[in-house]
Structure formats: structure tokens, C-alpha cells
Amino acid sequence: MDTMDTMGRHVIAELWDCDFDKLNDMPFIEQLFVDAALRAGAEVREVAFHKFAPQGVSGVVIISESHLTIHSFPEHGYASIDVYTCGDRIDPNVAAEYIAEGLNAKTRESIELPRGTGSFEIKQRETKAL
């Protein structure tokens, strides 16, 4: 893991070719996100998820260190996720990878942005076949 002198790290990930049923299962996604936060070492504070008709789930897990979010589009096999952590104690990539694996994403494209350092440049771009 690269260390950064930053107030936070923000992973933005595009997950493609995910399992339709998992993307449309709100209780599953909620538990997956709570587990991802805990696996990364975060402290969960609040959880809010919403199931859309006919399909799709959006939600947020508020952690002491910031948040994890998802917007799922089962009809496209796609989910957009954000994992933002403050400080350098927690690696947001741990949670993002756990989520991608849990949704059976075939492809994950992500970037990591340092936050709170003024002007920023993209520190990492990764496309990964899972």
C-alpha cells in the first residue's frame, strides 16, 4: 500500500458484468457493504439503503472514517461504488475489492483520489478482470 500525506482517500469504482440477482437484493447489498467496511477496519455508524422498482438499489454506510456508497443497475449488470476514508489508517481498496468480489463483478475499473490536499491528480487507475 502506498502511503499518502492526505486527509482522505477516495476510491471510485465501476463494476461491470455483476450478478443480476445480487445487484437487486437490498438485504444482501446492505450486509455486503457493512461487512466490507468492517473488513477494512472501519467503524460503522449508520446504514441507509433503498430498493427501487422495478430494480436497483442505492445505499450508504456511514463510517467514523467517512462513507461507502452504491448505485446498482441490475438490468445492465453494473454498479457504481465509492469508498471514502479519512486519514491513513484504513485502505479503501480493501473494501472496494471485497464488494467487487461479493457482486461477482467480472470487471472492476477504479481510480483513487487523495482528498484534502488541495489540487489533486489521479494516483491510481486500475482495470481488473475478476
Curated annotation (Swiss-Prot):
GO terms for cellular component: cytosol. It comes from the Bacteria. The active site is at residues 66, 71, 86. Coiled coil: none annotated. One of its GO terms (biological process) is spermidine biosynthetic process. InterPro entries: AdoMetDC_C, AdoMetDC_fam_prok, AdoMetDC_N, S-AdoMet_deCO2ase_core, S-AdoMet_deCOase_pro-enz. Is synthesized initially as an inactive proenzyme. Formation of the active enzyme involves a self-maturation process in which the active site pyruvoyl group is generated from an internal serine residue via an autocatalytic post-translational modification. Two non-identical subunits are generated from the proenzyme in this reaction, and the pyruvate is formed at the N-terminus of the alpha chain, which is derived from the carboxyl end of the proenzyme. Binds 1 pyruvoyl group covalently per subunit. The keyword Lyase applies. It is an enzyme of class 4 (lyase). Gene3D superfamilies: 3.30.160.750, S-adenosylmethionine decarboxylase domain. Catalyzes the decarboxylation of S-adenosylmethionine to S-adenosylmethioninamine (dcAdoMet), the propylamine donor required for the synthesis of the polyamines spermine and spermidine from the diamine putrescine. This is S-adenosylmethionine decarboxylase proenzyme.
